[in-house]
Curated annotation (Swiss-Prot):
Effect of residue 169 to A: Reduces NCAM1 polysialylation activity. Loss of autopolysialylation
Residue ranges that the UniProt entry lists as topological domain Cytoplasmic: 1-7
Result of altering residue 92 to G: In a colorectal cancer sample; somatic mutation
Record-linked Gene3D superfamilies: Glycosyl transferase family 29
Annotated EC: 2.4.3.-
Top EC group: transferase
Family: Belongs to the glycosyltransferase 29 family.
Protein name: CMP-N-acetylneuraminate-poly-alpha-2,8-sialyltransferase
Organism field: Homo sapiens
Keyword vocabulary terms for this entry: Disulfide bond, Glycoprotein, Glycosyltransferase, Golgi apparatus, Membrane, Secreted, Signal-anchor, Transferase, Transmembrane, Transmembrane helix
């Protein structure tokens, strides 16, 4: 009996020690993670990261402090962020590989699947730019346009088009949504999966004609195709390349460098933003810091409802569903959004999530 009481006493003491030690570690981590990194760059606390859904439930609370009126650019912070990002990547160089990087027949490993390889085809090589499409380019104001349904009824079209340089994601349609999203497109990303999702995998001539028509609207804009990320989209990339060449489209193709995504992730991880893989929107913002003096973001809203509880579509142009908080997702969009919101509040960028003021 005495031995049983002794074991219970030891067990109870052990549990208490574990409990208090855990609390001590949690307090230490919370203190460390709320500190700022470097010379004023951002860091997010774990409590903020874990309370993503509160942004919807507590509209107007301190969880989400966001004010567009009275926003002012913090030029010194913009320069500081640009300088620090340059320690990890140079967007002018890493935005695209160039012809001299490869020759037809070269074999490369996919960036996110090193076991799989890709052969550089003649079509792909012929479409590689001679020099970086962003070489020596600089703009006073840039718009990075995401695809969230938060753009619907925003009336942001004219404001977006007023910027010197407009970046759009995933070849999103613009003409039928011009009042809300504008039409100006200087730099457009296109994941290979878009071919299947938006253009039927080019199964018939009408799908191909629809795609060619969409690209013809871009004129000499930059079409940015992440061709070297993962196995599975290579046939779509080749079909796109073949159609561009066959129809002699003026669009300027670009294919991101093999180091870009890891360099971008490295920058954010260093600043205590624990992303798994940067979303296209975060990638574009990071690149834009190199050649834009003032960056405005639109269509960034990774939540199923707005602050008034109204349903928000994942994309403004389709009915695709997305689980923002799923651990299976390669992205951490709510965390990215909060990071961008912190930067907005500090004047490093302007994040518009509501209606635009008529100019």
């Amino acid at each position: 009996m005495r031995s049983i009481r002794k074991r219970w006493t030891i067990c109870t003491i052990s549990l208490l020690l574990i409990f208090y030690k855990t609390k001590e570690i949690a307090r230490t981590e919370e203190h460390q993670e709320t500190q700022l990194i470097g010379d004023g760059e951002l860091s997010l606390s774990r409590s903020l990261v874990n309370s993503s859904d509160k942004i919807i439930r507590k509209a107007g609370s301190s969880i989400f402090q966001h004010n567009v009126e009275g926003w002012k650019i913090n030029s010194s912070l913009v320069l500081e962020i640009r300088k620090n990002i340059l320690r990890f990547l140079d967007a002018e160089r890493d935005v695209s590989v160039v012809k001299s990087s490869f020759k037809p027949g070269d074999v490369i490993h996919y960036v996110l699947d090193r076991r799989r390889t890709l052969n550089i085809s003649h079509d792909l090589h012929s479409l590689l730019p001679e020099v970086s499409p962003m070489k020596n380019r600089r703009f006073k104001t840039c718009a990075v346009v995401g695809n969230s349904g938060i753009l619907l009824d925003s009336e942001c079209g004219k404001e977006i088009d007023s910027h010197n340089f407009v970046i759009r994601c995933n070849l999103a349609p613009v003409v039928e949504f011009a009042a809300d999203v504008g039409t100006k497109s200087d730099f457009i990303t296109m994941n290979p999966s878009v071919v299947q999702r938006a253009f039927g995998g080019f199964r018939n001539e009408s799908d191909r004609e629809k795609f060619v028509h969409r690209l013809s609207m871009l004129n000499d804009s930059v079409l940015w195709i992440p061709a070297f990320m993962v196995k599975g989209g290579e046939k779509h990339v080749e079909w796109v390349n073949a159609l561009i060449l066959k129809n002699k489209l003026k669009v300027r193709t670009a294919y991101p460098s093999l180091r870009l995504i890891h360099a971008v992730r490295g920058y954010w991880l260093t600043n205590k933003v624990p992303i798994k893989r940067p979303s296209t929107g975060l990638l574009m913002y990071t690149l834009a810091t190199r050649f834009c003096d003032e960056i405005h973001l639109y269509g960034f809203w990774p939540f199923p409802k707005d602050l008034n509880g109204k349903a928000v579509k994942y994309h403004y142009y389709d009915d695709l569903k997305y689980r923002y908080f799923s651990n299976a997702s390669p992205h951490r969009m709510p965390l990215e959004f909060k990071t961008l919101n912190v930067l907005h509040n500090r004047g490093a960028l302007k994040l518009t999530t509501g209606k635009c003021v008529k100019q």
